[in-house]
Amino acid sequence: MGADLYIRKLFDPQMKKYKRQIQIAVQKRDSALLSSDKDKAQKEVDRLYNIMYSKGYWRDPYNKYEVLDKMKFSYWVDFPCLTKNVKGRRMMSPENAKMLACLLEKRNMNLRGFNAEEKEYFKKGKNELIQFLNSASKLKQSIECSI
């Protein structure tokens, strides 16, 4: 489980382009008889999946690796103030995305108790989230927030 954020203008074309290719790769994997063929096919599924989710999508898990939490923000407390319900979807305006990006840029992360590799994960995640929010702002696109 986690928070899934989408910039539909970027994500939907990726989904449309790669969904069928992934389905074919999954069928190939599932019909493979040898474990080496299954492994090879799974690598192709993973590769296509990573490409499909490489644009217009950001995910934050609901566990100790939640990036937003390390900056003392909450999907349940703060996001309702930054989003509104539009036809059953939680949407964040481009203006609120820019505001949140600015707030996050200034926030320090509480990374006490994490090792160097984990700290790097959080720093990278923070930068990716800020870039994601700024992309929505620059494109003047709302963010769909599945939280």
Task: Mark where each language-model region is.
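Acidic (Asp/Glu-rich) sequence patches and key acidic residues
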Residues: 1-147
